[in-house]
Amino acid sequence: MNIEIAGVTRRFGRTEAVAGVDLSAGPGVLGLLGPNGAGKTSLLRMLATVIAPSSGRLRLLDRDPRGYAERKQIRRRLGYLPQQLGYYPGFTVAEFVEYFALLKEMPPAGVGRAVAAAIEATGLSGQARSKLRTLSGGMLRRAGIAQAIVNRPDLLLLDEPTAGLDPEQRVAFRAMLRDLGERATVVVSTHLVEDVGAACGQVALMDAGRIVFCGTPAELTTRGDGTDAAGDAPLERGYSAVLAAARAAVGARS
């Protein structure tokens, strides 16, 4: 397994953003679904080794990220697109992606080819020499995706990756995700149910810091059968039904 999490929590002061999560994942595309404030971004930042768990056990790519040397090895095999990625407006797209390739300590001889491949995969070949400050929001997001995949990561973490993409770009992105999931573990954090249904083989649904469902999109869909859960599509109704049941259970316990 490329991700192994047991009893992981993350607190910020008195707020418990992630509350005892258990999760494992191998190659494939996992959709991390949930409403805003569910804890998705905090969990993704722990998987990206940006922040450490407050408690619990976390192993990534068969390594323990608590040690500096192990964490460095993980980061060489990791791709991460945060929700808010800092861009250097004076860089061209190619320079921006190359900068991240060098940060990931890729062998210099292969950087040029890797940068070109990542830019092509995200549909930005025509903008490779364009300054970032001249790009639209959707193009900037694609440049962010390019830096995340430039090292052909074994673990790819994407936080709201389709934000700013138009419908055609989202379709192309979902196809790219499916291809990447053939060999790598891809975790996509989103609140858009349709992205999960189109690209993900597995779904983990978070609410109030906990994972309240883990299974396939088809299994999530069946949770809405025979209910009056809100949603225009079957998967949306399954999502709503699971959230309602989880919140009702919390209310009953309290």
For each feature predicted by the language model, list its residue ranges.
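Helix-to-loop junction immediately C-terminal to a conserved catalytic motif
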Residues: A48
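Conserved ABC transporter NBD signature motif
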Residues: G56-I74
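Conserved ABC ATPase "signature" region
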Residues: E98, L102, A109-Q127
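Conserved ABC ATPase signature
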Residues: K131-G138
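Catalytic Walker B motif of ABC-type/P-loop ATPase nucleotide-binding domains
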Residues: L156-E160
